[in-house]
Each structure stands twice: as structure tokens, then as C-alpha cells.
């Protein structure tokens, strides 16, 4: 399981710990990943995703998983999230027609 958010693509970053004496040692900055279950209102199902706390706030802000995925860019999404986005778009197109 990779340490990357499935919705925003946030992953591990690298940098330095810097002491008061300006000594530098390499370190990793890990994303704050949470295992959450989000409900798709369009599909009527719940999906278990591993997303960052920041992504969870963004999903809530945009009004749910469906709205977040419709507005998000495909290159940031994981393969599973892209599949989910296509399913939602297809279902919404059927409902509109």
C-alpha cells in the first residue's frame, strides 16, 4: 500500500530537520492518511478510500464525493478513483437523458 492520497495524489516529501546550530539531517514528511468510507449519492454505494485529512476536508467543502470527483483533475486521482469518477459521470448522464 503506497503512502499517497487516492484523491489528491499527496505523497511522501523529503526535507531536512534543522537544529538550532543549523545542523541538517534528512527526513521524510509523511501525509496524514486516513482510511475512510465515503458514500456516493449518485451510485448509492459506499466506498472505502485511503485519503489525506486535507482531502477529506475538501470533499466535505465541495459537497460530497460525487461533486469532488466531478471537479477534480484525472492526473491527481488514483486508478480506482478515476474508475469511480467515470461511473459517476455515466450514471449522471443517464439520469439527465
Curated annotation (Swiss-Prot):
Keywords: Ribonucleoprotein, Ribosomal protein
Entry's Gene Ontology molecular function annotations: structural constituent of ribosome
Transmembrane intervals: none
SUPFAM superfamilies referenced in this protein's UniProt entry, alphabetically: L28p-like
Pfam families xref list: Ribosomal_L28
Lineage: superkingdom: Bacteria
GO CC terms in record: cytosolic large ribosomal subunit
GO biological process per UniProt: translation
Sequence similarity: Belongs to the bacterial ribosomal protein bL28 family.
Protein name: Large ribosomal subunit protein bL28
Species of origin: Brucella canis (strain ATCC 23365 / NCTC 10854 / RM-666)
Amino acid at each position: 500500500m503506497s503512502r499517497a492520497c487516492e484523491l489528491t495524489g499527496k505523497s511522501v516529501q523529503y526535507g531536512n530537520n534543522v537544529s538550532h546550530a543549523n545542523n541538517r539531517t534528512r527526513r521524510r514528511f509523511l501525509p496524514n492518511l486516513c482510511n475512510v468510507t465515503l458514500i456516493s449519492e449518485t451510485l448509492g454505494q459506499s466506498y472505502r478510500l485511503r485519503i489525506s485529512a486535507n482531502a477529506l476536508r475538501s470533499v466535505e467543502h465541495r459537497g460530497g464525493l460525487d461533486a469532488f470527483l466531478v471537479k477534480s483533475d484525472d492526473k491527481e486521482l488514483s486508478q480506482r478513483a478515476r474508475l469511480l469518477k467515470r461511473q459517476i459521470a455515466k450514471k449522471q448522464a443517464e439520469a439527465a437523458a
